[in-house]
């Protein structure tokens, strides 16, 4: 079968105005970026307020492995399949970050015959949203240091400036730096560092804001430093919010593209789920719900990260509620969770599959614990055997009383996911329970962290380092104790040890640091060795990305 980029390049794309027309977006509401990409105007989005909303379907997954799960591919395939069976469906996805595109993970536009296109533009600069977010964050950093340089009227303690810088790249060399060296004209030297743009609080605010006014208000709440008498300093205090909102004004308009089958997809915002809250923008999700019968959206990595944050942060703040949840699993990945090495995955191994099933089992039980109906989508690979798929379906039926459906959308497009689409509609139109959360926000911050660790991760307890404990106490003293928790931890395990696969229990979740995201409305708990600035692998994807003799991109995946 051709590569993803070859399939995408061979597709005949519809003019974006035709795609928009299918869901009731008039041509005058589009800001076109070429023939096949457009932004949807703020005014049109506001005109949709009060309209009936469709049903929301959340796609999540088992704990990811290098074998690959295909969550975005399944999201696209399911959206195409829903359209094929007569439902008006829109997909809502996150924008890819340049860091993983040139690192290990690759792009985030789906795969095979279940892709969003134009794939190359989406995976690279797209409409410049990440550039705008990086620029707004960098403007804030410049204004903070400028305020300190010119008399420091706010009495900012330069030892307690929390606002790090960002760049949309994996670059471990920038994790910790010394800035303002070279003499008094360059400011006050201090330690600083960079995070990847998707970990910026500006990205989180961008994705949780309801409109421009809410965006500016949230930006103003961001705590960037402390005074010498330990009082919080916000971006509003340094008068950064107006200019930052101007930089983000156009970016806040959702991006409209299409699938290979010509169905509409909104791609907007892109926080990672291991170091941020992992969901696309609220504006895109709510716009889709007011235009379609079904919105299919994804939450990053496994259900312990993306889905938990989707519910405990995004749904809690907005009132959204999924009508159905799809948990994506693969035979290959479950065998890895059962102890099989990646190079040995080709052969049939029912014992390893059953052992690795514990990972899927916990994810299903966790999602059901939120009161949500679940179906398992088994993403089919050519190397899978019929016996393995039969075994997995049997395990789901007997142990969990949940339906598992084999999906072949990667090879067949929407036609390969029609059975999954029918199951999703049945769940979404069936009995719905009230949404429940993993914790009560009025409990202490440490208790909320412990609730996530013990209820969802299978941990025995949490271990909070003294520095983090002191900061948590300070957050509560300053009035932020009511905020929900955003766990930053490895995506590869329920624990904080990425090598501990399957469904470990009885472990300790180590919290080494915490960060306040007052504008986004949560507290980030940084667990284990997770980094908010990733590094490149030994052999990065960038090594094989180039232009061919015809000026076309080769090696992007």
From Swiss-Prot:
Reactions this protein catalyses: (6S)-5,6,7,8-tetrahydrofolate + formate + ATP = (6R)-10-formyltetrahydrofolate + ADP + phosphate
Enzyme Commission designation: 6.3.4.3
Q: Which UniProt keywords apply?
A: ATP-binding, Ligase, Nucleotide-binding, One-carbon metabolism
* Signal sequence, start to end: none
In Pfam terms, one family for this protein is FTHFS
**Top-rank lineage group of the source organism:** Bacteria
Family matches, as InterPro entries: Formate_THF_ligase, Formate_THF_ligase_CS, P-loop_NTPase
GO biological process assignments: tetrahydrofolate interconversion
Copy the pathway line from the protein's UniProt record: One-carbon metabolism; tetrahydrofolate interconversion
- The answer on whether this UniProt entry bears the keyword Chaperone reads no
Q: List residues binding ATP.
A: 65-72
Please list the GO terms describing molecular function: ATP binding; formate-tetrahydrofolate ligase activity
EC class (word): ligase
Q: Which family does it belong to?
A: Belongs to the formate--tetrahydrofolate ligase family.
Q: What is this protein called?
A: Formate--tetrahydrofolate ligase
What is the scientific name of the source organism? Methylorubrum populi (strain ATCC BAA-705 / NCIMB 13946 / BJ001)
The organism's taxonomic lineage, starting at the top: Bacteria, Pseudomonadati, Pseudomonadota, Alphaproteobacteria, Hyphomicrobiales
């Amino acid at each position: 079968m051709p590569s993803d980029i070859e399939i995408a390049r061979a597709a005949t794309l519809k003019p974006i105005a035709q795609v928009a027309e299918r869901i009731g977006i008039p041509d005058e509401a589009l800001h076109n970026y070429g023939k096949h990409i457009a932004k949807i105007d703020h005014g049109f989005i506001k005109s949709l307020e009060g309209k009936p909303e469709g049903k929301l379907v959340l796609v999540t997954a088992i704990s990811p492995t290098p074998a690959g799960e295909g969550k975005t591919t399944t999201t696209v395939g399911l959206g195409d399949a829903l359209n094929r069976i007569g439902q008006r469906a829109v997909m809502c996805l996150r924008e890819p970050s340049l860091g993983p595109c040139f690192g290990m993970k690759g792009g985030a536009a789906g795969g095979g015959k279940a892709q969003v296109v134009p794939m190359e533009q989406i995976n690279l600069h797209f409409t410049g949203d990440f550039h705008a977010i990086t620029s707004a964050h960098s403007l804030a950093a410049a204004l903070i240091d400028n305020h300190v340089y010119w008399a420091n009227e706010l009495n900012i303690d330069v030892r307690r400036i929390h606002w790090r810088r960002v760049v949309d790249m994996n670059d471990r060399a920038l994790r910790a730096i010394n800035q303002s060296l070279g003499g008094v004209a360059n400011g006050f030297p201090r330690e600083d560092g960079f995070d990847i743009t998707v970990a910026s609080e500006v990205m989180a605010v961008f994705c949780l804001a309801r409109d421009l006014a809410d965006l500016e208000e949230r930006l103003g709440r961001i705590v960037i430093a402390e005074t010498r008498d330990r009082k919080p300093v916000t971006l509003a205090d340094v008068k950064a919010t107006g200019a930052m909102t101007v930089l983000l004004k156009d970016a806040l308009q959702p991006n409209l593209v299409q699938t290979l089958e010509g169905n509409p997809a909104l791609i907007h915002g892109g926080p990672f789920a291991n170091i941020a809250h992992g969901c696309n923008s609220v504006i895109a999700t709510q716009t889709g719900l007011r235009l379609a019968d079904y919105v299919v959206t994804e939450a990053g990595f496994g259900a312990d990260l993306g889905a938990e944050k989707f519910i405990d942060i995004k749904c809690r703040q907005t009132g959204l509620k999924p009508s159905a949840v799809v948990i994506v699993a693969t035979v290959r990945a479950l065998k890895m969770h059962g102890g099989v090495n990646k190079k040995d995955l080709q052969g049939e191994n029912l014992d390893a599959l059953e052992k690795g099933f514990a990972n899927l089992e916990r994810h299903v039980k966790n999602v059901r614990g939120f009161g949500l109906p679940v179906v398992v989508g088994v993403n089919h690979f050519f190397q899978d055997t019929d016996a393995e798929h039969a075994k997995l379906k049997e395990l789901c039926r007997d142990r969990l009383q949940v339906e598992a459906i084999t999906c072949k959308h990667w090879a067949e497009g929407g036609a390969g996911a029609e059975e999954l689409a029918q199951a999703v509609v049945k769940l979404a139109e069936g009995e719905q329970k009230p949404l429940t959360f993993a914790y009560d926000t009025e409990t202490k911050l440490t208790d909320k962290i412990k609730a996530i660790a013990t209820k969802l991760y299978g941990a025995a307890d949490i271990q909070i380092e003294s520095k983090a404990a002191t900061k948590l106490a300070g957050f509560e003293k300053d009035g932020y104790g009511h905020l929900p928790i955003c766990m930053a931890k490895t995506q590869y395990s329920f624990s904080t040890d990425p090598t501990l696969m399957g469904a470990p229990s009885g472990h300790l979740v180590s919290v080494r640091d915490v960060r306040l995201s007052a504008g986004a409305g949560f507290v980030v708990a940084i667990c284990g060795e997770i980094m908010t600035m990733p590094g490149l692998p030994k052999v990065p994807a960038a090594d094989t990305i180039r232009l061919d003799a015809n000026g076309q991109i080769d090696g992007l995946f």
